[in-house]
């Protein structure tokens, strides 16, 4: 079932869809989302620039603006993601269907390129479809920026 990007966001926003979007909007750009307070945003931006293979930056929002103006101007990043993992001090502390109650006026959102974007091309080429997405932590160090550092994940 291939929905348009607007249809999948609407289904998520209205509670008709929760979870991963793999196989649902396969012909559209899909992105990972990182949201940080403005005080941490510059360091993360530099981290993404230094490590563009593992953090391919698609868009950065203005502080407090939950709308990705370039990629999806009809989207609301507080409500239009299938499931949000809330990470504090490096650990997942909660998973919620929307983050309106958590949103702060100093939040900056980073949209990062995702392998979900090309998963449909793999299916079209005859590769078996899967609901899981593999991520692998390598032994390659990322170039640090401020408080952001670690091994490359692909």
What does each model-found stretch correspond to?
Residues 2-15, 123:
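Long, contiguous binding/interaction regions
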Residues 3-9, 29, 81-85, 101-102, ...:
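N-terminal start-of-chain detector that recognizes signal peptides
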Residues 10-15, 37, 63-64, 88-91, ...:
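A short linear-motif detector with a strong N-terminal bias
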Residues 10-24, 92, 145-146:
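Amphipathic repeat-derived elements
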Residues 20-96:
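N-terminal low-complexity or amphipathic/hydrophobic leaders
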Residues 86-154:
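Conserved mixed alpha/beta catalytic, RNA-binding, or beta-rich assembly cores of soluble enzyme
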